[in-house]
């Protein structure tokens, strides 16, 4: 886990419906939104407020700062465990802190959404902490992690234990409903790979891989969108998926 010095550099956003403060007894589900590389999160929170207000949900959005170890590094958080910092455990600390501050928000299990770099985080959090997720939405990660025991982390899970102290609990992962989403036009070349050379191809490969291992996975291809923009449509796709499991 990270030292206290590093932990003090992490912050999180919270949204609760206005009526939270008017109710004597609170019963709220939790949605965690993970930002992408540029840390832009405001638009996703804005779009998620409608979901939260309609369905009695709270929203938590962590902010993972770049440059903690190397000044020009903005990717470490996507790996969850990197350079001695466990970003997944820092997030769980944030969620525990939120539970203390906002009684009635159920934090034992929660929904998780992320696009791009955030999608990488969600993908790997699913494998590291499946017991904490009600359902998750993995949005167009360029470097996904597959359930491949013959390839090292982060593409596969062969040495997963070296990073997290335990192997992937596949039976627990199989209990989590998974949505994979990607823009129809997100087909820009991002490098040669047996999983595909663009994000559309890689998301199809990820769905196939998950399904082959018994993970309930749906793939949504968003018409008219490439990799940027479309925050409203991406959140709406996740909302449609999540409300099945409230």
PLM segments and residue spans:
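Short, small-residue-biased leader/transition segments that mark boundaries at the very start
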Residues: 1-6
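Serine-hydrolase catalytic machinery in alpha/beta-hydrolase-like enzymes
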Residues: 10, 20, 26-108
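Alpha/beta-hydrolase
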Residues: 32-34, 139, 182, 222
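Short beta-to-alpha linker loops that shape the active-site pocket of alpha/beta-hydrolase fold enzymes
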Residues: 63-67, 142, 225
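Short beta-strand immediately N-terminal to the catalytic nucleophile in serine-hydrolase-like folds
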Residues: 112-114, 139
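Short glycine-enriched nucleophile-adjacent loop
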Residues: 119-130
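The feature captures the conserved acid-bearing segment of alpha/beta-hydrolase catalytic domains
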Residues: 135, 142-213
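C-terminal catalytic histidine-bearing segment of alpha/beta-hydrolase fold enzymes
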Residues: 204-246
